[in-house]
Design a protein with these regions (language model features):
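Short, structured patches in soluble enzyme cores that scaffold and shape functional sites
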Residues: 102-103, 114, 127-131, 143
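Short, conserved beta-strand element in jelly-roll/cupin
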Residues: 118-134
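Short, charged/polar surface micro-motifs in flexible loops or helix N-caps
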Residues: 84, 94, 131-135, 147
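Double-stranded beta-helix
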Residues: 16, 49, 134-162
Length: 162
């Protein structure tokens, strides 16, 4: 894991790690203060202390929001920030096109899956806005799975090894 400097791209070692394993972990892409401020923003929207046009129309999914960047400048700033865009471009070999955001108010347990099943030719970036522990929603990755075939829903319902 690596602490991030402002607007830094990936090192050659990080690029090689990504090519081999299909992921790279960067720490402190955003500061704890930036993350906590956004968490507070989201809590205030959810409990009605703060108003944002269109928020109610898109927040009826229980514990998460979808595509908030379309109507919330703060979410858009995170999505297109150079500290996120540069490492993505280094992994992809070209500038990334941001297409989707999701914010989870609490743990977001999901069964094993590949995001590319839902969004072909995509790369995902996960920003943990709070400290992650073994009990509050860690992200599990399978090194090298990017070189295997795409997992289908039928595969997930049975024992499956990449």
């Amino acid at each position: 894991m690596t602490n991030r400097s402002q607007n830094a791209g990936l090192t050659e070692d990080q690029k090689a790690f990504y090519q081999e394993n299909g992921y790279v972990i960067l720490t402190r892409v955003f500061s704890p203060t930036e993350c906590q401020d956004f968490v507070t923003h989201m809590e205030e929207l959810q409990n009605g202390r703060k108003q944002l046009e269109h928020f109610g129309q898109h927040s009826n999914y229980g514990s998460r929001t979808f595509n908030q960047h379309l109507y919330d400048p703060w979410a858009l700033d995170f999505l297109i920030h150079p500290r996120l865009a540069r490492p993505l471009a280094d992994c992809m070999g070209d500038e990334a096109e941001a297409i989707q955001t999701m914010h989870f108010y609490q743990g977001s347990e999901h069964p094993r899956h590949q995001d590319q099943y839902y969004l072909p030719d995509c790369m995902s970036a996960w920003i943990a806005m709070v400290d992650v522990t073994d009990t509050n929603g860690p992200l599990c990755l399978q090194p090298g799975s990017h070189r295997g075939r795409l997992i289908t829903k039928r595969d997930v319902s049975k024992e499956f090894s990449l």
